[in-house]
Amino acid sequence: MSAAQNKKIVEDAIAEWRTGNPEAFYEILDENVNWTVIGSTAVSGTYTSRQAFIDGAVQKIGKRVDGMVVPEIVDILTEGDKLVFRWDGIGKMADGTPYHNRYSWAMTFKDGKVVEGTAYLDTALVDTLMDLPDS
């Protein structure tokens, strides 16, 4: 697939996420995606499948936010099968504290699916979030 097609896949998934369907993004991840969350937070590490990433990071974060984190696209940069998606995640922590994190996700596509990704983010903010009890 072309860089433009990969960009469209991400844009469409984010549009769905913004309407209340965050699972749309996770559906573009290959079942055996290799996804790394940088840092030393409770959700940092390398996940070797879509389900492991959802279980090990996404759900843990989701249990500590009020509602969902809404993505605001900053920009999407593409070259060949590589794509960098910079975005702001906006929401509220379970205790009512505003949550505003800037993310940069570097991804590699193959046949329309993300096969590798690295998530860069404000890890200090994630530490604060992870200190909250599950909601």
Language-model features, listed with the residues they occupy:
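A solvent-exposed, acidic/Ser-Thr-rich amphipathic alpha-helical stretch
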Residues: 30-79
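Short, low-complexity N-terminal intrinsically disordered segments enriched in polar/charged residues
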Residues: 1-31, 131-135
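Hydrophobic pocket/interface hotspot
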Residues: 10, 24-29, 33, 53, ...
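A beta-strand edge to alpha-helix "cap/lid" segment located at domain peripheries
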Residues: 2-5, 58-135
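Short, flexible active-site loop motifs that bind/organize anionic cofactors or intermediates
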Residues: 12-15, 43, 116
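Generic secondary-structure boundary/loop-capping signal
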Residues: 25, 30-32, 44, 96, ...
